[in-house]
């Protein structure tokens, strides 16, 4: 399995680290790579778009040529997951901001405003199929 983490902006290293841990904990052989250019998408089974700032991510996806390539790969069947701003980038409808999204998921999200995320936290959560609790960041 080969999984990419979009390396444009946001919590990149955290997503790479936790994906490597998840693969190991599941006994799954695999590689986690950072995606910064369209050619980095080749051979991926999945892509994670991490949190960050959605307007920045959208702008950088377009500048790097990744916007349409990510859409094409996802439509062709590549798995894709987004956390926080990454989830915003996947939504078909966004409230609270003018951001062009990949529009890959039939969901509507309410975009938060700029500023500190004072309610963020980490917790160990139980996930069906995992033998141990999983350290998650919210």
Task: For each feature predicted by the language model, list its residue ranges.
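Cysteine-nucleophile active-site neighborhood
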Residues: 54-126
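N-terminal beta1-alpha1 cap of cysteine-dependent amidohydrolase-like domains
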Residues: 1-63, 68-75, 133
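Active-site oxyanion/phosphate-handling segment shared across diverse enzymes
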Residues: 125-138
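Generic structural signal for short, solvent-exposed loop/turn connectors between secondary structure elements
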Residues: 1, 97-98, 130
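Structural signal for conserved beta-strand scaffold positions within catalytic alpha/beta enzyme cores
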Residues: 5, 34, 82, 103-106, ...
């Amino acid at each position: 399995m080969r999984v990419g983490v979009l390396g444009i902006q946001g919590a990149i290293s955290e997503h790479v680290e936790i994906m490597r841990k998840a693969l190991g904990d599941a006994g799954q052989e695999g590689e986690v790579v950072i995606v910064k250019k369209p050619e980095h998408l080749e051979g991926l089974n999945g892509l994670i778009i991490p949190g960050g700032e959605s307007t920045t991510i959208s702008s950088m996806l377009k500048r790097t040529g990744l916007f349409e390539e990510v859409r094409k790969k996802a439509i062709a069947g590549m798995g894709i997951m987004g956390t926080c701003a990454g989830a915003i980038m996947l939504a078909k409808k966004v409230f609270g901001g003018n951001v062009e999204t990949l529009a890959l998921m039939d969901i509507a999200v309410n975009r938060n405003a700029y500023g500190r995320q004072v309610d963020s936290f980490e917790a160990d959560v139980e996930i069906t199929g995992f033998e141990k609790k999983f350290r998650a960041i919210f």
